[in-house]
Curated annotation (Swiss-Prot):
Keywords: RNA-binding, Transcription, Transcription antitermination, Transcription regulation. The gene is nusB. One of its GO terms (biological process) is transcription antitermination. The keyword RNA-binding applies. Involved in transcription antitermination. Required for transcription of ribosomal RNA (rRNA) genes. Binds specifically to the boxA antiterminator sequence of the ribosomal RNA (rrn) operons. This is Transcription antitermination protein NusB. SUPFAM superfamilies: NusB-like. Belongs to the NusB family.
């Protein structure tokens, strides 16, 4: 059984994510990565949201952990994603489930991919201040940090369909 504080998935390549020249986008990208890790940890370890916020904000985000430097993240954005997924999960999961291939219900998908798709679905439906293509691209990048290319294609396909459902106008403009 995996320890709660140690991810049981492929670690992201943090060397590709340099804190130099930090911009809002970098802090948001770091928040997305942290949110996916937090959602994963909550899913497999059963940790509560307040405990998870406290741990990530004091131990992971912006700190060096096991020799790896984690980028500072936009804390409010991190909290919004995690809290939003927890609050909306009963609506998000069936939405994702309907878009997955037959025989592959969400419960059968790897926990890290569930976390990526849940976070992406939440942002696409509830954070309309961020362009849909940016959201999809960012979560595909997050997925690349943990899984192989074939699995990131599934993330891209599911999130693209969700984006088109909730943000149709962004895809019909010329």
């Amino acid at each position: 059984m995996a320890e709660i504080n140690k991810p049981a998935f492929k670690k992201p390549d943090l060397k590709k994510m340099t804190p130099k020249g930090e911009r809002k986008a970098n802090r948001r990208g770091a928040a997305r990565l942290a949110a996916v890790q937090a959602l994963y940890q909550m899913d497999i370890g059963g940790a509560g949201i307040n405990e998870t916020f406290a741990e990530f904000e004091s131990f992971w985000i912006g700190n060096e952990v096991e020799g790896e430097q984690y980028l500072p993240a936009e804390a409010a954005f991190f909290r919004d994603i995690v809290a939003g997924v927890v609050r909306e999960q009963k609506q998000i999961d069936p939405l994702i489930d309907d878009l997955l291939a037959r025989g592959w219900p969400l419960a059968r998908i790897d926990a890290i991919l569930r976390a990526v798709m849940r976070a992406g679905a939440y942002e696409l439906e509830h954070r309309k201040d961020i362009p849909a293509r940016v959201v999809v691209s960012e979560y595909v990048d997050v997925a690349h940090a943990f899984v192989e290319k074939d699995e990131t294609g599934m993330v891209n396909a599911v999130l693209d369909q969700i984006a088109r459902r909730f943000r149709e106008d962004e895809f019909t403009r010329s």
